[in-house]
Structure formats: C-alpha cells, structure tokens
Amino acid sequence: MELTRVILHPYTTEKTYSIRNKSEHETLTFIVDKNANKYQIREAFIAIFGLKPLKIRTTNRRPAKIRTSTARPGYTKAKKIAYVVMPVGVKVAVSKEEVEAANAK
C-alpha cells in the first residue's frame, strides 16, 4: 500500500479536541485506510510530517443506523480511526488555522 494513501484526512470532533488538549502528550486523530495496520500508519505519519510518534492506537467504527424518510434505515460509512500520540513538547499543525498561525509567528 502506498504511504500517501494510508492517512486519508484529520478527524476533528468535540471528543478529539478534548483528547488533544487533556494530557501533556498531544494526541492527533486521523481517518485511515481500513486495511492499514499500525506500522503502515507510523511510516505514513513519518513520511508526511517528518516526526516520529510515541504511540498509535486504532479503532474500527461500525456503520450506525440513521433515519430516512423511507421505512428502511440508512447507514453511515464504516471508518477506521487512528489516535497518534506525540512525545511531550512536540506540536504538530494539522488544521489550516494552525498552519496559518504557525506561519504568522
């Protein structure tokens, strides 16, 4: 699998925002390819950001039922989420606003 196709995009929710700011280790969350393992995610992260993560945790989200106007329920997409834990003191700019703020300094 190509390293550029492992990490699809950042995953930002209220929960991930609170996880990121809760501890001394910065935790980043990404949606990754469903077939990617932790070693591939680590290599892709190093290739993209140039930083070595401390730890990587993954979880698979099942499709959830959603209401539709018909009698048959719809489903959300299944996804694999990677939680990338960085060493103490290492900051990574993931969002567009963070990159612009880092460039302004």
Curated annotation (Swiss-Prot):
InterPro entries noted in UniProt: Nucleotide-bd_a/b_plait_sf, Ribosomal_uL23-like, Ribosomal_uL23/eL15/eS24_sf
Organism: Ureaplasma parvum serovar 3 (strain ATCC 700970)
SUPFAM superfamilies: Ribosomal proteins S24e, L23 and L15e
Subunit structure: Part of the 50S ribosomal subunit. Contacts protein L29, and trigger factor when it is bound to the ribosome.
Protein's recorded name: Large ribosomal subunit protein uL23
Family listed: Belongs to the universal ribosomal protein uL23 family.
Job description of the protein: One of the early assembly proteins it binds 23S rRNA. One of the proteins that surrounds the polypeptide exit tunnel on the outside of the ribosome. Forms the main docking site for trigger factor binding to the ribosome.
Keywords assigned: Ribonucleoprotein, Ribosomal protein, RNA-binding, rRNA-binding
Pfam families named in the record: Ribosomal_L23 (PF00276)
Keyword Ribosomal protein tagged: yes
Molecular function terms from GO: rRNA binding; structural constituent of ribosome
Phylogenetic classification of the source organism: Bacteria, Bacillati, Mycoplasmatota, Mycoplasmoidales, Mycoplasmoidaceae
GO cellular component annotations of the record: ribonucleoprotein complex; ribosome
Single GO BP term: translation
Domain of life: Bacteria
